[in-house]
């Protein structure tokens, strides 16, 4: 590798940060995302993208159904600069029915921001997503939101995180008051109080007054009771709380905690500044040839998301690529690990929700969009130089099943195309009956809303109305060893055998009891709630 390229890669990695936000629905994720973009200069007013009509819709919620319902149902990538750093914000679905899409997004993230509602504390979806971060070893930064509303005591919230998640906590800032009495936050590192003025509905950057802790004006600006409460809290934190240890943070054992209000912009910029200082830079990725450092001179990356029809005018399909190593350049030739072919990466795009612009280069930590004419699948690796392949992204056990019918034979081509493209992008898992006479696809989902999205998009994007027939199953298990292992068992009862999109056998059960009964009768049968990962395997066409 040339010294010039080595220096270029080191500098690029140094200036990049990459993170996803995880939260329970209604914790304020979309609002926090908007405010981070506001401070990053990517938008001038929260809810309106720079150079776009003032539609006042959330920047990250671009899909028609999202804007109709006011919920986030698909992950997007939002890229912006702040203090010379290139930040890739991997926005995840806020609705719990789309946790699988969130998991795929976390595969591309170096850090996670755990957003918590101060009134509610830890909630079920947050706990689930924390476990995913823990499995992947992703550092977690906590932002406790909605301090401008009545909520639980800050010390109680820290204790809940420590007791339930097993994480040490370090409060980087500390709230002064809560609800109507919320006055700002205290920066423990700089020993400064940030007193905030409310901006117009939080749509503009908040102006704050910074006062040193020993400044005599503090008692004038704060109610006496709040001032003494702050002093007592700080003494307690210093006396019993741990010191900040960035090694523990990067190992996922300690979480820096920030308090604020995304709606009114309190504490958002302070969080962003410290996040850039503390967060992991793009690091090594495990591959078929071992760990590969981001400064490895050859280019490599993997597909973590596919999205069809981001631009309905052009009926396009985009593959989201996380750059892992080396330098990406427009029109470069790369090896496609799964299909074993050389392909040209033309028309690369920088992504900003639905907005896109052409780019010429990208570096480790960046996410780029590539037009996807049926070449890419989720989990695919592309590379130059020595052959390598990154770990695939597994599918998880769905809990709801339904047969999808097309009542209009004249729309069969559009129906098949729509189902195939939605399957490829992971909108829902698709399975098929082993009975060749039954051609209707079986949708397998984590939540009911996934079914609604599939039907909505088939009609909105492909012009196909469909009929959904719910099936009486709630448990799916993949058979380890495939069809051969299943044939050795012989005839089995109280289960239905189907095949997934890769042609692998899956057993569907009405309940967990039926599943356990089968395992009791056939202990030699090995079942898995997670689909085996074979990134080189091709989907079957039905």
From Swiss-Prot:
Coiled coil: none annotated. GO terms for biological process: regulation of translational termination. GO terms for cellular component: cytosol. Residues 14-283 form the tr-type G domain. Its main location: cytoplasm. It comes from the Bacteria. NCBIfam families: prfC, PRK00741.1, small_GTP. This is Peptide chain release factor 3.
């Amino acid at each position: 590798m040339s010294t010039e390229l080595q220096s270029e890669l080191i500098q690029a990695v140094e200036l990049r940060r990459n993170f996803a936000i995880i939260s329970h629905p209604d914790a304020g994720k979309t609002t926090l995302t908007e405010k981070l973009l506001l401070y990053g200069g990517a938008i001038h007013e929260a809810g309106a993208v720079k150079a776009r009509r003032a539609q006042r819709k959330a920047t990250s919620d671009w899909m028609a159904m999202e804007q109709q319902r006011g919920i986030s149902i698909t992950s997007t990538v939002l890229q912006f600069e702040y203090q010379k750093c290139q930040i890739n914000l991997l926005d995840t679905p806020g609705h719990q029915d789309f946790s699988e899409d969130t998991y795929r997004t976390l595969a591309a993230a170096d850090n996670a921001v755990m957003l918590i509602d101060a009134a509610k504390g830890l909630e079920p979806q947050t706990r689930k997503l924390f476990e995913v971060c823990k499995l992947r070893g992703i550092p977690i930064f906590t932002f406790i939101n909605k301090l401008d509303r009545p909520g639980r005591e800050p010390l109680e919230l820290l204790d809940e995180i420590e007791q339930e998640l097993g994480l040490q906590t370090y409060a980087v800032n500390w709230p002064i008051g809560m609800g109507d009495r919320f006055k700002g936050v205290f920066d423990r590192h700089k020993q400064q109080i940030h007193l905030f003025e409310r901006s117009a509905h939080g749509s503009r950057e908040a102006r704050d007054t910074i006062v040193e802790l020993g400044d005599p004006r503090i008692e004038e600006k704060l109610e006496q009771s709040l001032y003494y409460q702050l002093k007592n809290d700080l003494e307690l934190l210093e006396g019993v709380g741990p010191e900040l240890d960035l090694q523990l943070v990067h190992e996922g054992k300690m979480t820096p905690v920030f308090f604020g209000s995304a709606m009114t912009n309190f504490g958002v910029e302070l969080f962003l500044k410290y996040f850039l200082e503390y967060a992991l830079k793009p690091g090594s990725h495990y591959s078929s040839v071992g760990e590969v450092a981001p400064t490895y001179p050859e280019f490599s990356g993997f597909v973590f998301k596919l999205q069809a029809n981001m631009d309905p005018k052009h009926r396009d399909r985009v593959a989201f690529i996380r750059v892992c190593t080396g330098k990406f350049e427009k029109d470069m030739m790369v090896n496609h690990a799964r299909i074993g072919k050389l392909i040209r990466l033309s028309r690369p795009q920088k992504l900003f929700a639905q907005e896109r612009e052409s780019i010429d280069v990208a570096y480790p930590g960046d996410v780029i969009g590539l037009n996807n004419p049926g070449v890419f699948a989720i989990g695919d690796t592309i590379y130059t130089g020595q052959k390598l392949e990154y770990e695939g992204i597994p599918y998880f056990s769905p809990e709801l099943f339904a047969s999808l019918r097309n009542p209009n034979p004249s729309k069969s081509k559009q129906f098949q195309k729509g189902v195939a493209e939605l399957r490829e992008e992971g909108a829902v898992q698709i399975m098929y009956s082993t009975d060749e006479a039954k051609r209707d696809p079986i949708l397998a989902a984590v939540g009911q809303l996934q079914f609604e999205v599939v039907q909505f998009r088939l009609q909105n994007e492909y012009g196909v109305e469909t009929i959904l027939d719910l099936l009486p199953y709630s448990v799916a298990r993949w058979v380890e060893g495939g069809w051969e292992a299943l044939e050795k068992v012989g005839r089995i009862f109280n289960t239905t055998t189907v095949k997934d999109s890769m042609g692998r056998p899956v057993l569907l059960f009405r309940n967990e009891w039926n599943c356990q009964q089968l395992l009791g009768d056939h202990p030699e049968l090995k079942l898995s709630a997670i689909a085996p990962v074979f990134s080189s395997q091709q989907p079957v066409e039905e």
